[in-house]
A protein has these predicted regions:
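Periplasmic/cell-envelope proteins involved in peptidoglycan metabolism and beta-lactam response
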Residues: 1-243, 283, 336-341, 457-458, ...
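Beta-lactam-recognizing serine transpeptidase/beta-lactamase-like catalytic domain environment
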Residues: 63, 222-265, 270-504, 530
């Protein structure tokens, strides 16, 4: 090789070497590049998004009461073996799938596992092992948004921006941690929603329902303001396992307190109210156990004759014939108008997006039929109402004739400070009954419990008032008609504090009467009373 070629080769090599040196110098002095390189070694993990909670009227949590834990799984640290026993089947599947992962990941575990040398962080669990008011509150979809009930109605408020805390993990090429993870809190802007429910009263009613009913609901209203203190529907469901209940024949997702049902004799106080307002309190009827209307026979329960009964006796014995004849004396317009004033046939708004079923208040034209009107007078036929409508009616009697729309919402809350933000509902009231009529009805309904069909609602040491109802549904099982069993009333009878409605729907023969269930709830309320 000639000398010129050797010099050229050496020159080329020298040039390449100089270029490499210059490039290295530039890389070392370029801070932006260094930052970008560092960023490439940081893994960002997202903790579950924070969601606003529901609170009772005293500010106690109804959701988010329990804690779940998110454990950090790091490659090469034996996460599979250490955490397998502390997570559920889905978590175990995740561990298996990511057993050879090249970067850290988060895994939900059932406890704080920091004692195992594993970093973990708490996050609120939406539902507890014994969730409250599940049909009312609703549930979340797979993306964490409200899919039913109040969760859906307030989804935008509760979700906020949807942001959650982030975990910054600096790792090496093998995915192992180079430094302690850094938790970066996020402010999603989500707010809480305060309801009128009482957590203690709700828990009491839930416990009674669990012990006594298969299908139905329990409502408790604060008589003074018609605020809903408890709203229980049975059967229940697991908000974290919706698929198990979607096709269940007993409809566990249904909020029964807001649906409409045949009401039966629990409607008779409405007819009694119309009579008292019209000055017909002295009406007397001799009951042979049945009543003929244009050739059609309407029987009292079991066809049992009640003999001569006045308004008090007819309510105590729940005499169908008496109320048919009383209704005929009053006229359909008067009875229907009273029912309308007491809220029948009208949906009760709970939120902008949630309201009860309106039910069915038969039109005047329908009640022109003597048979249809006879049925109407003792709560049968086309008449349908929701348990909350029945509660509003009974509450009107209990609070002296003032009809107040039942309320479910209080305010939105700043969850950090507990400060109320926006009032969500206001008391709406109007006088429907005179004080004299309401007082007379209170005494009459106290008689139903003291010596009538509602005797199982009686409490030792405390008075109660109310009305039973057994409504035909037209549905049969094994040749036996299924019925709706009601009790609606208030405690104490003299100075009512709570209005309680119990419904057991589409049952052949329930294990407990609705009056007995009412008594259990009332006894629980007495224990809770300060």
């Amino acid at each position: 090789m000639s000398g010129k070629r050797v010099l050229a080769l050496y020159g080329a090599l020298l040039f390449c070497f100089a270029a490499v040196v210059c490039r290295l110098y530039w890389l070392c002095s370029d801070t932006d590049y260094g930052a970008r390189a560092a960023a490439q070694s940081v893994v960002t993990l997202h903790l579950p998004a924070r969601r606003g909670n529901f609170y009772d009227y005293r500010g106690q949590l109804l959701t988010g009461q329990t804690t779940r834990w998110m454990a950090l799984c790091v490659p090469g640290e034996g996460s599979y073996a250490r955490l397998f026993a502390y997570t559920d089947a889905a978590g175990q599947a995740t561990l298996y799938q990511k057993r050879n992962a090249a970067s850290p990941f988060l895994l939900e575990v059932d406890r704080d596992v920091s004692a195992l040398g594993v970093s973990c962080w708490p996050a609120a669990r939406r539902s507890s092992a014994a969730p409250l008011a599940v049909q009312l509150l609703g549930y979340l979809d797979g993306e964490g948004h409200g899919a039913a009930g109040l969760e859906a109605a307030f989804d935008e408020l509760l979700t906020g921006s949807g942001a959650g805390d982030t975990l910054l993990c600096t790792v090496n090429a093998q995915g192992k941690l180079r430094a302690e993870p850094v938790l970066t809190p996020a402010d999603s802007g989500a707010v809480g929603v305060q309801l009128t429910l009482s957590r203690e009263i709700q828990q009491t009613a839930e416990a009674v329902a669990n012990e006594t009913m298969q299908s139905g609901c329990i409502l408790v209203l604060d008589t003074a303001n018609a605020k809903v203190r408890a709203c229980v529907s049975r059967p229940g469901y697991d908000p974290e396992n919706i698929s198990a209940s979607l096709n269940a024949p007993d409809s566990p997702l249904l909020e029964r307190a807001f649906q409409c049902y045949a009401v039966g004799s629990v409607f008779k106080p409405v007819v009694a109210a119309a009579a008292l307002e019209a000055g017909e309190s002295g009406f007397v009827y001799t009951c042979p156990g049945w009543c003929a209307v244009d050739g059609r026979i309407f029987r009292c329960a079991g066809g049992i004759p009640h003999g001569e009964v006045d308004l008090a006796g007819a309510l105590e014995k729940s005499c169908n014939g008496y109320f048919i004849r009383l209704g005929q004396a009053l006229g359909a317009d008067a009875v229907r108008a009273m029912a309308e004033q007491l809220g029948f046939g009208q949906a009760i708004p709970l939120t902008d997006a949630l309201h009860t079923a309106a039910g069915v208040l038969p039109e005047r034209e329908a009640l022109a039929s003597s048979g249809a009107y006879a049925n109407f007078c003792f709560g049968q036929g086309e008449l349908l109402a929701s348990p909350l409508q029945v509660a509003a009616m009974m509450n009107t009697i209990a609070c002296g004739g003032i009809c107040r729309t039942p309320l479910l919402l209080e305010t939105t809350l700043d969850e950090t400070t507990g400060t109320p933000l926006t009032v969500l509902s206001h008391v709406r009231s109007r006088r429907v009954l005179t004080k004299r009529t309401a007082a007379a009805l209170q005494a009459l309904l106290a008689g139903v419990v003291a010596g009538g069909t509602g005797h199982e609602a009686a409490l030792p040491g405390q008075t109660a008032a109310g009305k039973t109802g057994t409504a035909q549904t037209g549905q049969f099982s094994g040749g036996t008609e299924l019925k709706n069993y009601w009790f609606a009333g208030f405690v104490p009878a003299e100075q009512p504090r709570y209005t309680i409605v119990v419904l057991q729907d589409t049952q052949a023969e329930p294990a407990f009467s609705s009056a007995a269930i009412f008594a259990r709830v009332a006894a629980g309320l007495e224990i809770l009373a300060p």
